[in-house]
Amino acid sequence: MDFSSKLLEQAVDEMSQLPGIGKRTALRLVLHLLKQPEEQTTQLSKALLELRQNIKLCNNCYNISDTELCEICANPSRVSEIVCVVEDIRDVMAIENTGQYRGHYHVLGGKISPMDGIGPSQLTIKPLIEKVQAGKIDEIIFALSSTLEGDTTNFYIFKQLEGTAIKTSTIARGISVGDELEYADEVTLGRSITNRIPFENSMKS
């Protein structure tokens, strides 16, 4: 792709680094921004910079937050003894949109994937196990995607919990194998949480 402007080329190159954005889409987005008032572009730049500089991870669940505790963990009406284990913030948002879950979350920050060089130590598994051992959790709900990596991560955590009295369950398989949680419709996902099954049963299916 030939550019008549180095500034335009640089902006397109940076925009195309975003996931799912190719050069042509990046060019379209950059040209759109150029047509907008300068104030709007400045506000976008400011919002992104503030996000990058000030965003935090919740001290309790590792969800993305503006404060030390996210709004969910800080809400006294939530059931802190029930913890839903998810991969990332997108899964938290998907489950929250169902309105069917009133417990806390634990965001792992990914899934175990040896092919990608991601092992248990790269995830927030250790703090989760420590909370269980401290007696702060009664039930863990595994809500990772129905993929090989998701199942591997679930099983690894389950094995780490052997010897504890913790109840472990997993969302019902209304989510198709290979699907990411964020793409499930709200009704299906809500039912999967409500109709969750003991984790041991899921290993037999």
UniProtKB/Swiss-Prot annotation:
It holds the Pfam family RecR_HhH. The keyword Repeat does not apply. Residues 81-176 form the Toprim domain. GO terms for biological process: DNA recombination; DNA repair. A zinc finger (C4-type) spans 58-73. One of its GO terms (molecular function) is zinc ion binding. InterPro entries: DNA_Rcmb_RecR, Rcmb_RecR, Rcmb_RecR_Znf, TOPRIM_dom, TOPRIM_RecR. Keywords: DNA damage, DNA recombination, DNA repair, Metal-binding, Zinc, Zinc-finger. Belongs to the RecR family. May play a role in DNA repair. It seems to be involved in an RecBC-independent recombinational process of DNA repair. It may act with RecF and RecO. This is Recombination protein RecR. It comes from Christiangramia forsetii (strain DSM 17595 / CGMCC 1.15422 / KT0803) (Gramella forsetii).
